[in-house]
């Protein structure tokens, strides 16, 4: 056991000392997998296997780097020496929130790791299932994956005391690994407080501009001093809980309908899209104080577009509606996210609607013909034709595999 512990300590030290090179290698391997489909038989399976393996290794490296870099103490002298010469970045709000729940709830940590493990390997599992099983059994495997993911997401909601799921649920590698590869022998760039164990950057290692930026980094906002649970609001009513439940169950509903009706039938696509919009509408209405509804809220503040229309003497209800829709200001203060963590999650869920361009009738009748037409027109051009040939190889993959177009 002691020898195994020493081996892990040695690997962690190696990871810290070569973090930049390891990150570059991971990025290169991922890039290679994008060009593999269509190059040889089962190339997409080989490429996805490499991609999944690199993704899992990256998840492990992220956890190691986060645990070592942001811990107040370290058990290994070599690791401490590496960190003594590094410029430790500030902990992000997302990392504060997710690391807090990992620390206070083991169940959250297990569920979050299991969810990210499944998401890293789900496409590979689907490829294997479609090669080994018949069509209906392969769809059963996909349904099983989505049911397990839904269960894990409900577990995250429960362990965070009725808060929405934040993606990704674990801290990420949010700093440049090259920052960990400074030479401490040349100039000590940080010092560690003996009483608190906190790492601070040395003033002697800073230029004038660096010192100014370092002082700015210590400027605290309301979100910086808030307790991690306050970065995401808990559900205030049953409508909010139902909205999150609908959002979590949305992929399960879609996959079950795909198994019954097929990908070309409009019913799975329409149902999934309506459920997505229903979840968003319920969430918005749940945030509005009781006695009001989102449809009865006062209009948002006048935008610059509305002002220009008034100056030009143009009165048009459609243009006024369009200007109001383009406004990024919320129609009620409660609709504004309480932190960047909550706001980024809302934005990510809004962007997920773009994936419907790769699904169902929209994919087969509009998006796919457009891409195929582009590939045909550019196949004899040198640079554009190269990228067109890559896109051509992905068309049958999106037709066959669900997880190529899944959120």
Protein language model features and the residues they cover:
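Hydrophobic, structured segments
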Residues: 157-358
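Membrane-lumen (extracellular) interface motif
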Residues: 35-46, 125-141, 256-271, 288-294, ...
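Helix-turn/linker elements and helix-coil junctions of extended alpha-helical scaffolds
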Residues: 60-68, 132, 159, 260, ...
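Membrane-embedded alpha-helical transmembrane segments of multi-pass integral membrane proteins
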Residues: 26-29, 33, 54-64, 115-125, ...
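Transmembrane alpha-helices of multi-pass eukaryotic membrane proteins
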Residues: 19-23, 41-54, 111-112, 136-149, ...
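N-terminal signal-anchor/initial transmembrane insertion module
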Residues: 1-106, 110, 117, 384-407
